[in-house]
Amino acid sequence: MARSKTSQRWLKEHFDDPYVKMAQRDGYRSRASYKLLEIQEKDRILRPGMTVVDLGAAPGGWSQVTSRVIGDRGRLIASDILEMDSIPDVTFIQGDFTEDAVFARILEAIGDHPVDLVISDMAPNMSGVRAADQPRAMYLCELALDLAGRVLRPGGDFLIKIFQGEGFDQYHKQAREMFDKVQMRKPLSSRDRSREQYLLARGFRGE
């Protein structure tokens, strides 16, 4: 079957992408690793010994970065609907985050340990129809914020991929009510044509 012009363009962009080449060189599973590395360089959200939850983790780029920083004393719980090859000392839970049973399994894996940081690079399968994609993306963001509100220690941080559009302003307001400081980040490694940004919320206020 002949490839469409769109898929041909994506393949050319992918293989010409310097971050794809860097990921291959540096041993990262995904170019997305560099988005987290850029944010880490600027904001220092990861530290040795932390307990971290990584949502939308597959294929494991963010988990690799996180694991390398938090080290042996740290704890990382990762989850995705897709399979992910194992990473040493990472607890992985496969399943649909929107399902109550999977949400409960993540909470069970966390247990009574206070979480220092929740990170999420989740996104729904995009149809290209913004009116359909945006609500689905925001629903994932809302679930992630709900999880963060349940498991973060006071003073903990939250980083999430989010798309500008319907529901964004309300979400931003909700995050400001829950955290001391909320900032937006657009890493250089995020593709120019992408609407994605990252919301960084610091200083969870707790109950």
UniProtKB/Swiss-Prot annotation:
GO molecular function: rRNA (uridine-2'-O-)-methyltransferase activity
Residues that hold S-adenosyl-L-methionine according to the record: G60, W62, D80, D96, D121
Catalytic activity: uridine(2552) in 23S rRNA + S-adenosyl-L-methionine = 2'-O-methyluridine(2552) in 23S rRNA + S-adenosyl-L-homocysteine + H(+)
Residues of the active site: K161
Keyword check for Transcription: no
GO annotation, cellular component aspect: cytoplasm
Presence of the UniProt keyword S-adenosyl-L-methionine in the record: yes
Chief location: cytoplasm
Enzyme Commission (EC) number: 2.1.1.166
Biological processes, Gene Ontology terms: RNA methylation
Keywords, ordered alphabetically: Cytoplasm, Methyltransferase, rRNA processing, S-adenosyl-L-methionine, Transferase
Localization annotation: Cytoplasm
Segments crossing the lipid bilayer: none
Function: Specifically methylates the uridine in position 2552 of 23S rRNA at the 2'-O position of the ribose in the fully assembled 50S ribosomal subunit.
Protein name (record): Ribosomal RNA large subunit methyltransferase E
Gene from which this protein is expressed: rlmE
